[in-house]
């Protein structure tokens, strides 16, 4: 089975749907398709179904610029985000272009044919399917959907209760009245604890957040009161645009302040924790051993985690795991924490391009040896884009302008009769650091060796800066001397 499309998008999550909407709106006559491994669209927001799952960025900036998020809720729940993505796909007619249940294994470029051949397997039937396209766009994110990161905990087989990972939450898990230990201190852990603990029916008897080291945690309002008031008098579009611009500025200023005055911002963040939990709190449980934004900050709506801890329904323990026991976890300090259920909120496994192999003119494409061009295209990879969002701001801010840039690129190629566009480095700009070099999170460190390289200068640097990226992607000339164009197969030789 072989089908040809002008544009083929791998992944029907937040980035894939957004990119498809851009291309469909700009080029209504182009044939496009999305290949999605799961049986529903939504990507992360269909996969993650653990209690309390929500965005960790405000929805004004996490939503698409071209389709406003029309709610004053700041951090939305996972089901609402998935529905927003689905509604967007329906509105733009993208939902009809998705091929579900397909695991893409290889993509092979032929300079002679000027096209990609993409091979995958329909997992429900085992049928091999082949697609060809003029332009290929990967929107698969950067983590492995099959398995989250799980350290090799000693004695885990001895534990008599149930051990689960948030990435694959069991639908039948009943934690009501149970003693729960959540291992971890990142965004997933600080979301799970208040969602599972408390006095509501179905809540756990007690939840212990067991962390090796603390993370920075700060509170955001659950509801955007300013937008709520403005919405009574102004059109939704105006309210959304104001809220979006304001929040982009706040995100950027917070990040810049943490980088410029890290010790001051550290004191302010810790002061806020002490203010919410009281002066008697053991601050060693909330004082990280790194500076703000060396790792991503954890946002909690209306301080829900702090309220849960203050109520006694949950607690925090900072220690290291010696071994799992029949009844729970024995820490290196000698303390044993009893548990009926252990949740290993221990992070993600990095995976590039959804695990897809790239082959360019018969040669294996070595992604860790290449750089990204403007954070969107890949060095020496013809007619290929890779959409990756921000790690220091809302993911969608970057994926949105990347989709708009691709439309500019495709328009430039069409207007000038080009069939191929390939970024080439003629100045040896590659550095021996990964593209996320500004972030020291565990999952980034574990995945350094499989990521593309960071470049020494533009356009090979990954900036993680919305205003600068917006100018580069939306305003700067497409033809910059680094991006090489060819009008026919014989004019193009891939490196």
UniProtKB/Swiss-Prot annotation:
One of its GO terms (biological process) is biological process involved in interaction with host. InterPro entries: FAD-binding_MO, FAD/NAD-bd_sf, Flavin_mOase-like. Its EC number is 1.14.13.-. GO terms for cellular component: peptidoglycan-based cell wall. Induction: Expression is controlled by VirS. Induced at acidic pH and in macrophages. The record marks 296 as: Transition state stabilizer. It comes from the Bacteria. Binds 1 FAD per subunit. Keywords: FAD, Flavoprotein, Monooxygenase, Oxidoreductase. Belongs to the FAD-binding monooxygenase family. PANTHER family: MONOOXYGENASE, PUTATIVE (AFU_ORTHOLOGUE AFUA_8G02570)-RELATED. This is Putative FAD-containing monooxygenase MymA. The gene is mymA.
């Amino acid at each position: 089975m072989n089908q040809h499309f002008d544009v083929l998008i791998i992944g029907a999550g937040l980035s894939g749907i957004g990119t498809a909407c851009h291309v469909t709106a700009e080029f209504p006559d182009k044939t496009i398709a999305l290949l999605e491994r799961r049986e529903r669209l939504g990507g992360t927001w269909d996969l993650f179904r653990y209690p309390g799952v929500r965005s960790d960025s405000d929805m004004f900036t996490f939503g698409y610029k071209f389709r406003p998020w029309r709610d004053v809720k700041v951090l939305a729940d996972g089901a609402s985000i998935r529905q927003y993505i689905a509604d967007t796909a329906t509105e733009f007619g993208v939902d009809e272009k998705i091929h579900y249940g397909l695991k893409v294994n290889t993509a092979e470029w032929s300079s002679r044919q000027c096209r990609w051949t993409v091979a995958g397997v329909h997992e429900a039937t085992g049928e091999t399917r082949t697609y060809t396209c003029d332009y290929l766009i990967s929107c698969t994110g950067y983590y492995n959907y099959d398995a989250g990161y799980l350290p090799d905990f000693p004695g885990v087989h001895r534990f008599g209760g149930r051990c689960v990972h948030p990435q694959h939450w069991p639908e039948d898990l009943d934690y009501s009245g149970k003693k729960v230990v959540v291992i971890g201190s990142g965004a997933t852990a600080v979301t799970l604890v208040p969602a599972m603990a408390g006095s509501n029916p179905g809540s756990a008897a007690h939840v212990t957040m067991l962390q090796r080291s603390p993370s920075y945690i700060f509170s955001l309002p659950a509801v955007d009161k300013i937008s709520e008031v403005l919405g009574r008098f102004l059109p939704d579009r105006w309210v959304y645009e104001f809220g979006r611009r304001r929040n982009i500025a706040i995100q950027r200023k917070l990040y810049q302040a943490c980088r410029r005055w890290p010790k001051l911002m550290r004191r302010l963040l810790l002061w806020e924790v002490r203010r919410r939990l009281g002066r008697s709190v053991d601050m060693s449980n909330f004082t990280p051993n790194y500076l703000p934004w060396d790792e991503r900050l954890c946002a909690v709506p209306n301080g829900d985690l702090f309220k849960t801890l203050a109520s006694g329904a949950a607690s925090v323990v900072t220690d290291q795991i010696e071994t799992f026991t029949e009844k729970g976890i024995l820490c290196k300090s000698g303390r044993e924490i009893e548990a009926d259920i252990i949740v290993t909120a221990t992070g993600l496994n990095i995976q590039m391009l959804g695990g897809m192999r790239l082959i360019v003119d018969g040669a294996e494409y070595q992604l860790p040896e290449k750089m990204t061009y403007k954070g969107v295209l890949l060095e020496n990879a013809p007619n290929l884009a890779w959409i990756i969002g921000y790690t220091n701001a809302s993911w969608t801010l970057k994926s949105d302008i990347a989709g708009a840039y691709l439309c500019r690129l495709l328009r430039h190629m069409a207007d000038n009769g080009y069939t191929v566009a390939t970024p080439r480095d003629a100045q040896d700009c590659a550095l021996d650091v990964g593209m996320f070099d500004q972030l020291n999170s565990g999952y980034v460190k574990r995945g350094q060796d499989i990521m593309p390289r960071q470049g020494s200068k533009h356009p090979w640097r990954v900036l993680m800066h919305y205003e600068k990226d917006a100018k580069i992607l939306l305003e700067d000339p497409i033809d910059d001397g680094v991006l090489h164009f060819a009008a026919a197969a014989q004019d193009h030789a891939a490196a």
